[in-house]
């Protein structure tokens, strides 16, 4: 079964290379088989991840308990910084990619769900979302930092990953 899944992943990855945007990255196949995303896909996903982290954490600053607010403030500060760093790489011409203007549909759905919650329900969902978002971000940054095709972006991803790993550990601790 595992071999069939991996073979299917390779087939999707190969087929998707003929199209502009990577279906393999969108569907998670690249993550499953450990393949680095294309530069454009990495920029899109990293920027959208920052947007989600900032928006959801600003909401947590309004609705959460003190421990969660402390975490949320760090997320806002850190992700605003990484967002600016990524923008500088792209606008400075070191990375040939287009920054997205909005987060993904799934991130919008997660944020919409959070906006409908209050109290303990909000806190539990925010903690779970943060853990999931940081697991995905760590994986994305690891894959690009290890095997990305743009040297400047690859170095930035590798430099940024330890902070994301720390965020993940913090999110896991909050989620207990």
Task: Put a short name on every predicted segment.
Residues 2-9, 16-176:
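His/Met- and acidic-residue-enriched segments that coordinate or traffic transition-metal cofactors
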